Curated annotation (Swiss-Prot):
Molecular function GO labels: RNA binding
Classification via Pfam families: Intron_maturas2, MatK_N
Family to which this protein belongs: Belongs to the intron maturase 2 family. MatK subfamily.
Organism expressing this protein natively: Calyptranthes pallens
Keyword terms, alphabetized: Chloroplast, mRNA processing, Plastid, RNA-binding, tRNA processing
Gene Ontology cellular component annotations, sorted alphabetically: chloroplast
Official protein name in the record: Maturase K
Function text: Usually encoded in the trnK tRNA gene intron. Probably assists in splicing its own and other chloroplast group II introns.
InterPro entries documented for this protein: Domain_X, Maturase_MatK, Maturase_MatK_N
Gene: matK
Entry superkingdom: Eukaryota
GO BP term, example: mRNA processing
Lineage: Eukaryota, Viridiplantae, Streptophyta, Embryophyta, Tracheophyta
Length: 504
């Protein structure tokens, strides 16, 4: 038990105080404002607080915070205080973004020191989303079962605050965070099917709190995973017999609630366990038996309910066989397929037919959800037919074309790892025709007339970035570059998920 506590306390050694005074510094809110501007979507029009925020509003907010009871932005202020009643949402957005910048400081300093200690010069190479898929392609083709887990999102507010206490020792900041969460939780969080949907005005703070909570949960899983290869072997006579399974379960639960983790470790000796998390989902894949996967399922349910005090329904964890299951992950639909090949072997006068089955990891783009996202962004209707997108009257033709080109290239860049490009061709067709209809609507002309005016050069502008790069690398072998483009291409410079991909 002491070893386990030491493992959890290892990354908490750097603790920082006196974060509360930073709330009264204007540059903190300027940093938050710049962060939102740099990361705003090019797909959706959003008149968020970055269009309304100004230094005058920030100064007014800081002035009010100096006054007594200034941080009470509740609904009652709409009657008692017209100023806050009119700008209630705007002030809460500015405050939450600024507070998120402050509480991220201890984590940022810890990350920098960790990278310096490990002598990692280019940490951005480790953050690419596409780097996950070569790992899955290399590992999952050798595994048999997968646990598809939907994380519980009904987390008590006090649990989130208690998690931060290990990192932030500033009591004033924690009290302020507790008050802010209790005031705004219901208005800023909208529970959806599986995960909470944070309001577009306040995503950074709540994503930070949720991820810090997930970090606490994953530290225990990582400890079990790292220790599993060093466990002593267990007798298989009783351990794997189904008749004694429920007896072992009772002992396992008692050991867990007594915090005796050494008994728990006996249950998880699996060098082939792999774990990946994305938003409110996580995947645990293993080469072991269904019985072993059921033990992991039971452990996860009890871990969330009795350690994190969050209700976790067993139905939110599904055990599936990889060869018959598709994983929706990061905008891709991944699966392990068996490719059969028949080989005829001739030995003297005898001939043999050998049937070889090879596992192959495939990733495709699910077209129906992607068309749904295009429909929400007003590029097409629900059936996938392109429509004109409303634009401002002062937008030039070059600005409209450039915006559509950036969207098309970003989507092609992100989905370059698809093993089948047919879905991408359809998406490019929708964006291209939507661009033409938008321009024709602006100039009050028909689509056919406007296409004749633009000519074939307009269609060539929608040539994807991958095709251009490969044509430069293989200028004399066009067929080679085309064949490479049709294959899977993973990039190491993708650090964020497209809003059109994030359709869940």
């Amino acid at each position: 038990m002491e070893e386990f506590q030491g493992y959890l306390e290892l990354d908490r050694s750097r603790q920082h105080d006196f974060l509360y005074p930073l709330l009264f510094r204007e540059y903190i809110y300027a940093l938050a404002h710049d962060h939102v501007l740099l990361n705003r979507s090019i797909f959706f029009e959003n008149a968020g607080y970055y269009n309304k925020s100004s230094s005058i509003i920030v100064k007014r907010l800081i002035t009010r915070m100096y006054q007594q009871n200034x941080l009470i932005f509740s609904a009652n202020d709409s009657i008692q205080n017209p100023f806050f009643g009119h700008n209630n949402n705007l002030y809460s957005q500015i405050f939450s973004e600024g507070f998120a910048v402050i509480v991220e400081i201890p984590f940022s300093l810890r990350l920098v020191s960790s990278l310096e200690r490990k002598e990692i010069a280019k940490s951005h190479n480790l953050r690419s989303i596409h780097s996950i898929f070569p790992f899955l392609e290399d590992k999952f083709s050798h595994l048999d079962y997968v646990l598809d887990v939907l994380m519980p999102y009904h987390i008590h507010l006090e649990i989130l605050v208690q998690t931060l206490r290990y990192w932030v020792k500033d009591a004033s900041s924690l009290h302020l965070l507790r008050f802010f969460l209790h005031e705004y939780w219901n208005s800023l969080i909208t529970p959806k099917k599986h995960i909470p949907i944070f309001s577009k005005g306040n995503p950074r703070l709540f994503l930070f709190l949720y991820n810090s909570h997930m970090c606490e949960y994953e530290s225990i899983l990582l400890f079990l995973r790292n220790q599993s290869s060093h466990l002593r072997s267990t007798s298989s006579g009783i351990f794997f017999e189904r008749i004694y399974f429920y007896v072992k379960i009772e002992h396992f639960a008692k050991x867990f609630f007594d915090n005796d983790f050494q008994c728990i470790l006996w249950f998880f000796k699996d060098p082939f366990m792999h774990y990946v998390k994305y938003q409110g989902k996580s995947i645990l894949a293993s080469k072991d038996t269904p019985l072993f996967m059921n033990k992991w399922k039971y452990y996860l349910v009890n871990l969330w309910q009795y350690h994190f005090y969050a209700w976790f329904q067993p139905g939110r964890i599904n055990i599936n066989q990889l060869c018959n299951y598709s994983i929706d992950f990061l905008g891709y639909r991944s699966s392990v397929r068996l490719n059969s090949s028949v080989v005829r072997s001739q030995m003297l006068e005898n001939s043999f037919i050998i049937n070889n089955a090879i596992k192959k990891f495939e990733t495709i783009v699910p077209i129906i959800p992607l068309i749904g996202s295009l429909s929400k962004a007003n590029f097409c209707n629900t059936l996938g037919h392109p429509i004109s997108k409303p634009t401002r009257a002062d937008s030039s033709d070059s600005d409209i074309i450039d915006r559509f080109l950036r969207i098309c290239r970003n989507l092609s860049h992100y989905h370059s790892g698809s093993s089948k490009k047919k879905s991408l061709y359809r998406v490019k067709y929708i964006l291209r025709l939507s661009c033409v209809k938008t321009l024709a609507r602006k100039h009050k002309r028909t689509v056919r007339t406007f296409l004749k005016r633009l000519g074939s050069e307009f269609l060539e502008e929608f040539l994807t970035e991958e095709e251009v790069v490969l044509s430069l690398i293989f200028p004399r072998t066009y067929s080679t570059s085309r064949r490479l483009y049709r294959g899977q291409i993973w990039y190491l410079d993708i650090t964020s998920i497209n809003d059109l991909v994030n359709y869940e």
